[in-house]
């Protein structure tokens, strides 16, 4: 069983409000990672992003900051796709003030992804290589092979998030996650979304995953629950090991 970090997903439209700061401070004991979603923003000026990152750092919370630009192709609000997405990531990697960066998997662009991963790691960032499917869950062998292929690019963490349409989909995701945790170098994350897949969030560590994503208020993905509740449920497995 692996140790699971709780990531809280926040998505401020512009600046981080005083209320959001208070919420983060109040729940800090339940949070290991702040996933800062920036795909919903209107401004992507370097100075604006630097100020945003500094605001989080100034809270002096004992957390890592993961910056995510989720494209519309993978279920986000970001309109940057293809080369414009990769060029944006190159600029993002040059900015200081955060700890981890999410890079979306695309099998047709492995050379570009490899370059971005190397650049990010050279800049001192951990890389989460992620793949999302908000419609379905691929079959078990496809899930296992996805982890294998993503691992070959050298990211620190590989993440699959898929939508279950039946109970077997959840079981397949968890089996693929467990297999990956014992067979690849990268640390795996596996999420079965929606209420049906909730067990994948609460029992993430049992199957070898290392991050479970929660929220403070409005869920940023189907099936997310409040970080305080998520931390309590994860601790049940720690207590009863």
Swiss-Prot record:
It is an enzyme of class 4 (lyase). Transmembrane segments: none annotated. GO terms for molecular function: 3-dehydroquinate dehydratase activity. One of its GO terms (biological process) is 3,4-dihydroxybenzoate biosynthetic process. HAMAP family: AroD. PANTHER family: 3-DEHYDROQUINATE DEHYDRATASE (PTHR43699:SF1). Belongs to the type-I 3-dehydroquinase family. This is 3-dehydroquinate dehydratase.
């Amino acid at each position: 069983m692996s140790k699971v970090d709780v990531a809280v997903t926040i998505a401020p439209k512009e600046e981080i409000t005083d209320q959001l700061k208070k919420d983060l401070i109040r729940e800090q004991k339940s949070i290991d990672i702040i996933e800062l979603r920036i795909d919903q923003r209107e401004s992507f000026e370097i100075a604006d992003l630097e100020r945003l990152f500094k605001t989080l750092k100034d809270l002096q919370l004992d957390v890592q900051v993961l910056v995510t630009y989720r494209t519309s192709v993978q279920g986000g609000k970001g309109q940057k796709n293809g080369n414009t997405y990769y060029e944006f990531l190159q600029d993002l990697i040059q900015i200081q003030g955060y700890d981890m960066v999410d890079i979306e998997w695309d099998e047709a662009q492995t050379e570009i992804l490899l370059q971005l991963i190397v650049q990010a790691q050279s800049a001192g960032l951990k890389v989460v290589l992620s793949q999302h499917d908000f419609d379905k869950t691929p079959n078990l062998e496809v899930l296992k092979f996805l982890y294998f292929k993503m691992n070959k690019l050298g990211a620190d963490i590989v993440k699959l998030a898929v939508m279950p349409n039946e109970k077997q989909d959840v079981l397949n995701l968890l089996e693929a996650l467990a297999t990956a945790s014992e067979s690849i170098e990268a640390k795996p994350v596996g999420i079965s979304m929606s209420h049906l897949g909730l067990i994948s969030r609460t029992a993430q560590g049992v199957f070898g995953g290392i991050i479970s994503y929660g929220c403070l208020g409005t869920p940023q993905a189907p099936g997310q629950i409040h970080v305080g509740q998520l931390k309590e449920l994860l601790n049940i497995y720690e207590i009863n090991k």
